[in-house]
Amino acid sequence: MRWRTIQARYCFLLVPCVLTALEAVPIDVDKTKVHNVEPVESARIEPPDTGLYYDEYLKQVIEVLETDPHFREKLQKADIEEIRSGRLSQELDLVSHKVRTRLDELKRQEVGRLRMLIKAKLDALQDTGMNHHLLLKQFEHLNHQNPDTFESKDLDMLIKAATADLEQYDRTRHEEFKKYEMMKEHERREYLKTLSEEKRKEEEAKFAEMKRKHEDHPKVNHPGSKDQLKEVWEETDGLDPNDFDPKTFFKLHDVNNDGFLDEQELEALFTKELDKVYNPQNAEDDMIEMEEERLRMREHVMNEIDNNKDRLVTLEEFLRATEKKEFLEPDSWETLDQQQLFTEEELKEYESIIAIQESELKKKADELQKQKEELQRQHDHLEAQKQEYQQAVQQLEQKKFQQGIAPSGPAGELKFEPHT
């Protein structure tokens, strides 16, 4: 089984959290002539980074499990609920000894890695009185009570931890984007306060003009609508719009031939629409906003099409969606520039948080400055004492010389001048 087939079943585990734009893969036009496209084995595709701090461990466990024929067969037949509930994890008891041995080794390596992280954290905090075993409990993707062998409970915990973490990922991205937009507006207003009235009016006019230029773009098709998909068919795939066929379209954009449109493949379909609104060469277009728009489009299409909420679109789900009225006559799509991303109350609350953080940073900076000044004072005092000591030694040597006493060395020994 290829990795992407495994990824399809573990979609909620390994769905890629892509932050950068994904271009649609160019398609050979002749491929559309074959409507019953057979899946073909292609070169191994590296699994995407999930963004989880245990990403490498997760991928290695999946790679080892896919080498066991029994587990692979069970995985192919399992539905998402069976995987999520932990019933599939019980099949681990039936895998080969070789696979179990490799899983045991992976777990020991992961436990060792986590212990090194904990030690580094404790060393940084200079706190050696904490219990390492208790600290291991904060890592919920493995059974810390048994650090030596990989059991069904480990697989169950790994699945549940990754599921929860990835489901939270999109929500976190939306929250971070909102904070980003509020920070931009906060900094803009703070900058205006530093300007004269004339300069402020010029900046306000410049801002309004950039906003107008950004909003002046071609109509954006409703994501997942017939018009949107036909535009991809014609302009990206280079095909005749009159020959548009949903089934062929699905197979063309199922890039890895695994029978699903995953989140990467879906997001690639929106590049043409996003190009209408965002251009990296234009000062008025923000590429971070473009990625938020891409995320919103993907989430919308998934909510409309993905009936079993497994974060994958099957051919059946895709074709069923093309039969709906909304596919032919969708509502207009509102881009980010047509929406209020935050209220004045939310901005004021965010600014109050920033003010508190800045106050704390200023307090720390003042404390560091005082420490620096105290260290400098101590340094100057030591330098002054050093100079006084050197002067005293010189005066003593000079006095001894005047009295005809041989000068002494650093350890007090007598120094005799050679006779000439």
Swiss-Prot record:
GO terms, biological process: insulin metabolic process; negative regulation of appetite; negative regulation of cAMP/PKA signal transduction; negative regulation of fat cell differentiation; negative regulation of glucagon secretion; negative regulation of insulin receptor signaling pathway; positive regulation of fatty acid oxidation; positive regulation of testosterone secretion
Domain EF-hand positions: 241-276, 293-328
Compartments where located: Golgi apparatus; Endoplasmic reticulum; Nucleus envelope; Membrane
PROSITE patterns: EF_HAND_1 (PS00018), EF_HAND_2 (PS50222)
An annotated Gene Ontology molecular function: DNA binding
DNA-binding region: 171-223
Impact after mutating L319A: Abolishes binding to and activation of GNAI3
InterPro entries (alphabetical): EF-hand-dom_pair (IPR011992), EF_Hand_1_Ca_BS (IPR018247), EF_hand_dom (IPR002048), Nucleobindin (IPR040250)
A Pfam short name: EF-hand_7
Annotated consequence of substituting L315A: Abolishes binding to and activation of GNAI3
Primary localization: Golgi
Keyword Metal-binding: yes
Subunit structure as annotated in this protein's UniProt entry: Interacts (via GBA motif) with guanine nucleotide-binding protein G(i) alpha subunit GNAI3. Preferentially interacts with inactive rather than active GNAI3. Interaction with GNAI3 is inhibited when NUCB2 binds calcium, probably due to a conformational change which renders the GBA motif inaccessible. Binds to the postmitotic growth suppressor NDN; coexpression abolishes NUCB2 secretion. Interacts with MC4R.
Family under the similarity heading: Belongs to the nucleobindin family.
Protein's UniProt name: Nucleobindin-2
Organism of origin: Rattus norvegicus
Protein's gene: Nucb2
